[in-house]
Amino acid sequence: MKKLILFLFLSTSLFCFGQGKSALKDIQSIKFYGVDYSQAKVFGADESPIQFKDAFRRINELFITEAKKYNVGKQLKKEVTEISLDAVNQVNENINLAELMTTKREYSLSKEQIKAAIEALPIQKTPGVGMVFIAQFLDKSNNRGTYEVVFFNTETKEIIEEWITDGKARGFGLRNYWAGSVYSCLLYTSDAADDLI
């Protein structure tokens, strides 16, 4: 039943994304800001919140240290003019560790929460288009990570387009395991770009 709900949610999100495809089609370049974990919840994991917080920082570093694998520009077929992790590192550093873990088997962000997360990113308000992954639910019991892909105006922080996606977590060690879900979502983003942009 839960898989059916997720499928319907993904289908609805992709339909909405398709409605805004002309806006994304006209975008030639983007600034990439990494993965924002400030709104995320973790379910079913044995590791501590502080271990997750450290893993979040190291996952984002992969966009620099393993840029060939985690190549956002290649997947989107757009020029990435800048990869800046400062903003997500700052908000991730301020995660409330007492609220990171959850006992609830389902969790998702509202449109208002996503908008607030974009507003909270401490970036310079210059003309351009930014992209960020906003982590929603890291579900160890199902080996899945759910993320919101968000394109936004970096000057006004107005959201241009967004959609939800999830990816299979895999790999050895806490960082690599959840980085696997990010990589899966990055590949899915490439498929979505081919279909909808």
Language-model segment annotations:
Residues 18-101:
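A structural "domain/chain start" motif
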Residues 188-193:
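Conserved small/polar residues in nucleotide/adenosyl-binding loops
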Residues 37-40, 136-141, 168-169:
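Solvent-exposed loop/turn segments at secondary-structure junctions
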Residues 93-153:
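Surface-exposed short loop/turn segments
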Residues 7, 33, 132:
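Residues in well-ordered beta-strands of folded domains
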Residues 1-23:
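Bacterial Sec-dependent N-terminal signal peptides
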Residues 155-187:
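Short secondary-structure boundary motifs at beta->alpha junctions and helix caps
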